[in-house]
Amino acid sequence: MAVPKKKTSKAKRNQRSATWKGKAAIAAKRAMSIGKSVLSGRAQGFVYPVSDTDEAEA
């Protein structure tokens, strides 16, 4: 016979939410860092292709 599961406690729910939000914050921080390095021209850790047509249009 099917039995309903126990309710997840608020503490566990908040802990999972904090972990999820923390991972998102780290990803956002890394994205901002990469964006800043690309704009400043100091990007060394990855290849950022720049086509000549984009420069001509700007």
From Swiss-Prot:
Gene Ontology CC terms, in alphabetical order: large ribosomal subunit
Keywords attached to this entry: Ribonucleoprotein, Ribosomal protein
Coiled coil: none
Sample GO molecular function, one term: structural constituent of ribosome
Region feature Disordered, mapped onto this chain: 1-23
SUPFAM superfamilies documented for this protein: Zn-binding ribosomal proteins (SSF57829)
Gene3D superfamilies with a match to the protein in the record: Single helix bin (1.20.5.640)
GO biological process, one term: translation
Protein family per UniProt: Belongs to the bacterial ribosomal protein bL32 family.
HAMAP family in the cross-refs: Ribosomal_bL32
Name of the protein described by the UniProt record: Large ribosomal subunit protein bL32
Originating organism: Synechococcus sp. (strain CC9902)
Upper lineage: Bacteria, Bacillati, Cyanobacteriota, Cyanophyceae, Synechococcales
